[in-house]
Design a protein with these regions (language model features):
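Short alpha-helical functional segments enriched in proximate histidine and acidic residues
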Residues: 18, 221, 237
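Short, hydrophobic alpha-helical segments
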Residues: 152, 234-241
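Gly/Ala-rich beta-loop-alpha elbow adjacent to hydrolase catalytic centers
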Residues: 31-35, 39
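Flexible "cap/lid" subdomain of the alpha/beta-hydrolase fold that forms the substrate-access gate
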Residues: 2-16, 20-21, 25, 30, ...
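Catalytic histidine-centered segment of alpha/beta-hydrolase-like enzymes
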Residues: 189-194, 218-231
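Short, hydrophobic alpha-helix immediately C-terminal to the catalytic nucleophile
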Residues: 40-44, 145, 231, 235
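Short glycine-rich catalytic loops that host catalytic nucleophiles or stabilize transition states
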Residues: 211-218
Length: 241
């Protein structure tokens, strides 16, 4: 699969077949990160049965930055990431290559990232085991990331980010008046405040019914960092009226 469209369809076409068999009508679709980008594309192609779209820290909302720092001028760690991404090396491949050391590495990452949530040892182990096994499983959709997204470092802020090759701000439109809610964490590495707010304003001018909400005390995994506020938002905004 080479084009962005082909890689997006790899995900959303099977989802449509599944939901059609379930005979779902008037439902709310919620997607996170790359899943948010894919959910928006799903709604553009198959949105006639959707009542609402909720995007949690979606990738690819703002436009590509006009000026970026080239790979040769990046710190060594960033150059390695750029090289790996360009070669389509995925986190799953790295975990699988580590063999029996993989579970320990994933456990350490989970324990460090979510230390503030106060999970006990058993909770951390369960989440770590889950993430390890879905990451170490035979690769499939992970190989599409390079075709859909691209890591870039903005020249004006020297801030790294991941952007869509076909940003949502340039393509998001729906045949029906579909309400769209975008949520980011206040410490979310995908939330570029100025650019995301401008994207939302542009989409509103284009006629979309879209809102942007920032969830406090949360990062990219806002549903874990602040589940109360995220859950309350979803439950309070799932009306079909």
């Amino acid at each position: 699969l080479q084009s962005v469209e082909d890689n997006v369809n790899f995900f959303i076409d099977p989802l449509e077949r599944c939901l059609s068999k379930l005979k779902l009508e008037n439902y709310v679709l919620c997607g996170h990160s790359l899943g948010g980008y894919l959910s928006a594309n799903f709604a553009m192609k198959y949105g006639d049965k959707l009542s609402r779209l909720i995007l949690l820290s979606p990738a690819g909302l703002p436009p590509l930055p006009s000026r970026t720092i080239g790979p040769k001028d990046l710190p060594m760690a960033m150059r390695l990431i750029d090289s790996a991404w360009s070669s389509n090396v995925t986190p799953g491949q790295i975990v699988r290559a580590m063999g029996h050391r993989g579970p320990t590495m994933v456990h350490r990452i989970v324990r460090g990232r979510f230390r503030s949530l106060g999970w006990n040892d058993e909770q951390t182990r369960v989440i770590s085991d889950y993430l390890y096994h879905i990451t170490a499983a035979p690769g499939s959709g992970e190989f599409s990331m390079n075709s859909i997204l691209v890591p870039l470092v903005r020249a004006d802020t020297a801030r790294p980010g991941v952007f869509a090759r076909e940003p949502l701000v340039h393509k998001m439109n729906f045949s029906n008046r579909l309400p769209v809610h975008v949520l980011y964490g206040d410490n979310d590495w995908l939330y570029h405040e100025k650019e995301c707010n401008e994207a939302i304003s542009n989409l509103r001018r284009d006629g979309l019914e879209i809102s942007l909400n920032v969830i406090p005390k949360s990062g990219h995994h806002l549903y874990l960092d602040n589940p109360k506020d995220v859950n309350n938002f979803i439950l309070n905004n799932n009306s079909n009226t």
